[in-house]
């Protein structure tokens, strides 16, 4: 993690078909959690020309107008006409949702809530680095910001000829573990057919790329590739089939940290694929914020139906102020990583998840949300509220 001289990460916009699918799945989850916080949800979505298929396993007392919900998400992203390539008003919505298996439920549900078992076996990772202000790797942070700016320029009318689908990629150069330059930038954006490539490239360079990336990291040899294949009129679900869970590296650390393989979107907090990955980020970020290390990666693993993690391991890549073994002892003392405890620690039983489904689950600022008369914190795993206690306990 600390040995690369050059590292590249990518991101995609909210209009990318895989991200559209993620947002639909998480919108379904949010709608259910609003009325039934203890629902079991595993919602998968596929989007393709003229159709959205929603499936999975859901056990809940809540009722959701699925068709209206799906159409609303599609239209919010501005897929509103066949000219753009996808129309939330006219596309077909197919519902193939079933209930959670009783075999899985018996492994999760317990008489004592704190004994709640993990919803599946698996391994999850959390990571943090002090190379950016949000304690995230720079390449993925810059990549997210580019496509966020693309959406902002499109929605505000600054660049009205932009369309929803876009991808970004940023290559950073490192010296002694610190970012010293950006060597390459790729930004491909869907657009209306009547804009010229010359106008598009000039506007995107000035109003998106230069507006977003730190000027001090751009240099005379930085490569810029804006719509390198030429026109990009056909996009979204017409150009590519979109599926929930296909952008797990975009969702996390851009490849800078390991990934256990489990996707996030459409899953309620009883699924440790999601909740334990969030807890891992929370732990790693507080360790770095406390100054215990410059970089930290934590792995946690579970067995289905078992509350206690089967393992907790940690690596600070030689940047720790104390030994990794001592940091693990602090983690065990300050963080309860049983599934039910994670849900309580991070207050996860709220409809906050659609907001996570584009532009990364990590490196986002926590903020207050109010839904259904209840106020809660979105992105609570980004808080650094345990850093002071960790620092005191470490004696540094």
Curated annotation (Swiss-Prot):
Gene3D superfamilies listed in its UniProt record: 3.30.300.10
Name of the gene: metK
Protein known as: S-adenosylmethionine synthase
Binding sites annotated in the UniProt record for Mg(2+): 18
InterPro entries named in the record: ADOMET_SYNTHASE_CS (IPR022631), S-AdoMet_synt_C (IPR022630), S-AdoMet_synt_central (IPR022629), S-AdoMet_synt_N (IPR022628), S-AdoMet_synthetase (IPR002133), S-AdoMet_synthetase_sfam (IPR022636)
Subunit organization: Homotetramer; dimer of dimers.
Pathway linked to the protein: Amino-acid biosynthesis; S-adenosyl-L-methionine biosynthesis; S-adenosyl-L-methionine from L-methionine: step 1/1
Signal peptide: none
Positions of ATP binding: 16, 165-167, 231-232, 240, 246-247, 263, 267
Keyword field contains Repressor: no
Reactions the enzyme catalyzes: L-methionine + ATP + H2O = S-adenosyl-L-methionine + phosphate + diphosphate
Pfam families xrefs: S-AdoMet_synt_C, S-AdoMet_synt_M, S-AdoMet_synt_N
Main location: cytoplasm
Family, as annotated: Belongs to the AdoMet synthase family.
GO cellular component: cytoplasm
UniProt keyword terms in alphabetical order: ATP-binding, Cytoplasm, Magnesium, Metal-binding, Nucleotide-binding, One-carbon metabolism, Potassium, Transferase
Cofactor: Mg(2+); K(+)
Enzyme class, first EC level, given as a word: transferase
Chain sites annotated for binding K(+): 44
């Amino acid at each position: 993690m600390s040995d690369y001289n050059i590292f590249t990460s990518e991101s995609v916009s909210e209009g990318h078909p895989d991200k559209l699918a993620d947002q639909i799945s998480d919108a379904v989850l949010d709608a259910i959690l609003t009325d039934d916080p203890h629902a079991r949800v595993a919602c998968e979505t596929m989007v393709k020309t003229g159709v959205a298929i929603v499936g999975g396993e859901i056990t809940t007392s809540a009722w959701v107008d699925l068709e209206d919900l799906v159409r609303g998400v599609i239209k919010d992203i501005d897929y509103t006409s066949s000219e753009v390539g996808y129309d939330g008003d006219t596309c077909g919505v197919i519902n193939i949702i079933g209930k959670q298996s009783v075999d899985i439920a018996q492994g999760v549900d317990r008489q004592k809530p704190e004994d709640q078992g993990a919803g599946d076996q698996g391994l999850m990772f959390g990571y943090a680095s002090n190379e950016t202000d949000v304690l995230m790797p720079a390449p993925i942070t810059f990549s997210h910001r580019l496509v966020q700016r693309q959406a902002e320029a499109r929605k505000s009318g600054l660049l009205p000829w932009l369309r929803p689908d876009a991808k970004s990629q940023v290559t950073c150069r490192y010296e002694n573990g610190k970012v010293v330059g950006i060597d390459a930038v790729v930004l491909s954006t869907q657009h209306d057919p009547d804009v010229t490539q010359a106008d598009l490239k000039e506007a995107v360079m000035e109003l998106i790329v230069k507006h977003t990336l730190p000027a001090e990291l751009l240099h005379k040899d930085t490569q810029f590739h804006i719509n390198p294949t030429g026109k990009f009129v056909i996009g979204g679900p017409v150009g590519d089939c979109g599926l929930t869970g296909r952008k797990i590296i975009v969702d996390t650390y851009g490849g800078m940290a390991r990934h256990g393989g489990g996707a996030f979107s459409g899953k309620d907090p009883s699924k440790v694929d999601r909740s334990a990955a969030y807890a891992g980020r929370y732990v790693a970020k507080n360790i770095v914020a406390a100054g215990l290390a410059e970089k930290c990666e934590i792995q946690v693993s579970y067995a289905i139906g078992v509350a206690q993690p089967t393992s907790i391991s940690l690596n600070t890549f030689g940047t720790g102020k104390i030994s990794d073994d001592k940091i693990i002892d602090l983690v065990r003392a300050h963080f309860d990583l049983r599934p039910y405890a994670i849900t309580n620690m991070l207050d996860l039983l709220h409809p906050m998840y659609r907001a996570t489904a584009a532009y990364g689950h990590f490196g986002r600022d926590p903020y207050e949300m109010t839904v259904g008369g209840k106020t809660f914190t979105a992105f609570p795993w980004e808080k650094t509220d345990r850093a002071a206690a960790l620092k005191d306990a470490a004696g540094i």
